[in-house]
A protein has these predicted regions:
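Catalytic nucleophile serine of serine hydrolases
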Residues: 332
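Conserved P-loop NTPase catalytic core
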Residues: 350-374, 380
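Extracellular/periplasmic helix-exit of transmembrane alpha-helices
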Residues: 339, 343-350
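Flexible phosphate-sensing "switch/lid" loops adjacent to ATP/NTP-binding sites
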Residues: 1-320, 327, 344, 369-370, ...
C-alpha cells in the first residue's frame, strides 16, 4: 500500500498545529502504523540536533519522539533561524547553507523546493503515514505566490488538509471563514474539515457557531479540542513564554531566566517547571527580583543580546547577584556572555570585532564561520558550590553553536565522553572557583532527571529551604495523555477516512 499523507494547516501562527501533529503521530503509532512528521520549512530558534549531527526544528524532533522514531533532517529539510540584522541563517538538510535577507531568500526557493520534494519522497518510501505541518496561515496574500510550506506542499504530497483555528484568542469563526474566502477554489478543495482548538467552556453554547460554520463552508467540524495545561510538551513559539503562569508559595525556589531578545532553545528549562519551583522569564530590571537561581539561556545573537543586557542595566545586576552568592548558569550563548570577552574578527555575528563579557568566568570566545552541531554524552566535572556532590553524574544533550571558547581558569563544567562521530574525551564549559557560576555549551542538560533533581536539592540546601520530593516528566506518558485528549475530542474515524479514503476499523 502506498504511503498516506495528512496535512495540518492553521488560520495563524501559534494555533496548535505542532501539538496536534505530535498527537496524531502518537495516535497513528498506537494504532500500529509507521508514521513520520514533516514540515518543509520551519522558522524557529528552538532547534534540535539529530544523531547524524543535523539541525532541525525542535517541533519536528518532538513529533518524531511522539511517533516513536529517530528524528531525521528529512522531517524538516529547511530551517530558518532569524538573526539580529533582519537576515536568517538558512539550514538545509541539517547544515548551514548561507545567510540571507528575505528579499534574497525568495530567489533561492526553487532550489529548496527540489530538496523538499526529495525529503518528502524519502519519508513516503519509508513510512505508512506522513503527517505534514504547515506554517502560519495558507492565506497570507503577500506570501502565497512564493510559499513553500503550505498549499504548495499539499499539492506536492497530494495531502488532504485539516484546518485548525484557536478559539482561546477570539475570532475563530472569522479566521476560518476568512481563510477559506482568501483561498482559491482549488485550494479549498484540499481542505477536508476544521478543528477548533483551545476551547474553554460549555460545548453546547458553541454549537450554533459550529452549525453556521459547516453550513457556510460546506466542510465538517471534525473536533473541538479543549484548552489544557496538564500535559507538558516542548513548545516552539515564543508566544508560549507569554502564557507562563507565575506562582509562588512558601518554600518555593525562585528561578529567573533572562528573556533575551533572540532567546533560543528555551525548552531546555521545561523540566524545571515542577512543584516547588517558580520558573519565570524576565526582560527588565523591574522583573528580576531576588531569585534563588539566575539562568542566561541560549541565543541566536550573542553579541546583540549582550548589548541588550548592558543597555537595560541588567549586566551589572547579574554580576552583582553572582558576587553576592546567587548561583548563575549560562547555556550556550549565555555561557559565552559570562566570560571576559567575545571576539568576532570575521564579523560572523555583528559589525563589532570585540565586546566585553560579564566577567563572571575567565573565558574568551572567538567566533568563526564553523557551526558545531552534535549530540553528546558527558559527565559533570564540577564539584563545588552549587555542584557539590554532583561530580561524575552522566548526562546527555547536544551542542549547537558558533565559535570556540577557551577557559583560562582551567576548571571545566563537564567532561564529554562520547559523540556519534567518535570524537570524545574533551572538556566543555567552565565553572567559577566558588562553584556558583557555571557555563556550558550543552543544551538539554536539565532533561537529565538525576542531574536536575540533585541540582535542585543542592540549591534548596544552599538557600536554606526545606527538602522536598522531586519529580521528573515522563515524556512518553505525556504523549499518551495528548493522544487520549485528541482521541476523545476528534472524530478519528473521519480522520482515518480522510487519510485513507475509506473507513478504518
Amino acid at each position: 500500500m502506498p504511503a498516506r499523507t495528512l496535512m495540518i494547516q492553521g488560520t495563524a501562527s501559534s494555533v496548535g498545529k505542532s501539538i496536534l501533529v505530535a498527537g496524531l503521530c502518537r495516535i497513528f503509532r498506537q494504532d500500529g502504523f509507521k508514521v513520520a512528521p514533516f514540515k518543509a520549512q520551519n522558522m524557529a530558534l528552538n532547534s534540535f540536533v539529530t544523531t547524524e549531527g543535523g539541525e532541525i526544528g525542535r517541533a519536528q524532533a518532538v513529533q518524531a519522539e511522539a511517533a516513536g522514531i529517530e528524528p531525521s533532517v528529512h522531517m524538516n529539510p529547511v530551517l530558518l533561524k532569524p538573526e539580529a540584522d533582519a537576515s536568517s541563517q538558512i539550514i538545509v538538510l541539517g547544515k548551514v547553507a548561507k545567510n540571507l535577507k528575505a528579499s534574497q531568500y525568495y530567489s533561492y526557493t526553487p532550489k529548496l523546493l527540489e530538496i523538499i520534494k526529495d525529503s518528502l519522497n524519502h519519508l513516503l518510501a519509508n513510512y505508512d503515514i506522513v503527517v505534514i505541518e504547515g506554517a502560519g496561515s495558507p492565506a497570507e496574500i503577500n506570501l502565497k505566490k512564493r510559499e513553500i510550506v503550505n498549499m504548495r506542499v499539499a499539492r506536492m504530497a497530494k495531502a488532504p488538509v485539516l484546518l485548525i483555528g484557536d478559539i482561546d484568542r477570539g475570532g475563530v469563526f472569522a479566521s476560518i471563514i476568512g481563510t477559506m474566502e482568501l483561498l482559491t477554489k482549488q485550494e479549498c478543495a484540499f481542505i477536508r474539515g476544521f478543528i477548533i482548538n483551545k476551547f474553554r467552556g460549555d460545548l453546547k453554547l458553541l454549537k450554533p457557531g459550529l452549525d453556521m460554520l459547516e453550513k457556510r463552508t460546506g466542510k465538517p467540524i471534525l473536533g473541538v479540542i479543549p484548552y489544557f495545561r496538564h500535559i507538558s510538551i516542548a513548545q516552539e513559539d515564543s508566544v508560549y513564554l507569554d502564557e507562563r503562569q507565575i506562582t509562588s508559595a512558601s518554600g518555593t525556589l525562585d528561578i529567573a531566566i533572562i528573556r533575551l531578545p533572540h532567546i533560543s532553545n528555551y525548552d531546555d528549562f521545561d523540566p524545571l517547571e515542577e512543584p516547588g519551583c517558580n520558573l519565570r522569564y524576565v526582560s527588565n530590571l523591574s522583573e528580576i527580583g531576588n531569585p534563588d537561581l539566575l539562568i542566561l539561556p541560549g541565543t541566536k545573537s550573542t553579541i546583540a543580546d549582550l548589548i541588550y543586557l548592558k543597555q537595560q542595566g541588567l549586566a551589572p545586576v547579574i554580576a552583582g547577584m553572582a558576587q553576592s552568592g546567587v548561583p548563575v548558569i549560562g547555556i550556550c550563548g549565555g555561557f559565552q556572555m559570562l566570560g571576559s570577552s567575545i571576539l568576532d574578527p570575521e564579523k560572523v555575528e555583528s559589525k563589532q570585532d570585540r565586546i566585553d563579557g560579564l566577567g563572571l568566568l575567565k573565558t574568551t570566545t572567538i567566533f568563526n564561520s564553523h557551526k558545531r552541531t552534535t549530540q553528546v554524552k558527558a559527565r559533570i566535572a564540577a564539584d563545588d558550590g552549587l555542584f557539590k556532590g554532583l561530580k561524575d553524574i552522566n548526562v546527555t544533550g547536544y551542542e549547537i553553536h558558533m565559535g570556540q571558547t577557551t577557559n583560562a581558569n582551567g576548571q571545566p563544567a563537564l567532561h564529554v565522553i562520547e559523540t556519534p562521530s567518535g570524537e570524545a574525551d574533551y572538556f566543555d564549559g567552565a565553572v567559577s572557583r566558588s562553584g556558583l557560576v557555571f557555563g556550558t555549551y550543552i543544551h538539554g542538560l536539565f532533561h537529565n532527571a538525576e542531574f536536575t533533581n540533585r541540582l535542585l536539592s543542592r540549591l534548596r540546601q544552599l538557600r536554606g529551604l526545606p527538602a522536598t520530593s522531586t519529580s521528573s516528566i515522563d515524556k512518553q506518558e505525556m504523549y499518551d495523555k495528548l493522544a487520549d485528549v485528541i482521541r476523545h475530542n476528534l472524530d478519528m474515524s473521519k480522520v482515518y477516512e480522510i487519510t485513507f479514503g475509506r473507513n478504518h476499523g
